[in-house]
């Protein structure tokens, strides 16, 4: 049996989008309450009954959240233009080697705007 496991995380951060068009509201300093969904997919282990241990996903994501929470995202290497697309790809790059079966990162910047990233 195959299954997908998703774990949700949140962080608060400020940002500017320096490459947004002149006059765009996101060029100025602003912040979001971000929600991140990390999904792994694979075969369910017949012994444990799970695809992957939730705690291991949390352990991989926790140091990243510590770096991002209440930060100015533009100051973080790789997030100089921190669009939700770039944030999703950044998480993927950091987690791919730590989370076997990583299949999707979703970054929500508002309740109605999100980016779904499934690797390059």
Task: Describe the predicted segments one by one.
Residues 1-120:
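Charge-rich, low-complexity N-terminal segments
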């Amino acid at each position: 049996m195959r299954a997908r496991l998703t774990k949700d995380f949140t962080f608060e951060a400020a940002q500017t989008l320096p490459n947004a068009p002149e006059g765009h509201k996101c060029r100025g300093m602003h912040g979001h309450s971000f929600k991140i969904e990390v999904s792994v997919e694979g075969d369910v282990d017949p012994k444990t009954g799970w695809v992957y241990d939730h705690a291991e996903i949390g352990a991989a994501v926790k140091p990243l959240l510590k770096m991002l929470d209440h930060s100015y995202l533009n100051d973080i290497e790789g997030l100089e233009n921190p669009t939700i697309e770039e944030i999703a790809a950044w998480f993927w790059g950091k987690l791919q080697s730590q989370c076997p079966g990583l299949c999707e990162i979703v970054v929500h910047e508002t309740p109605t705007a999100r980016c779904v990233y499934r690797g390059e």
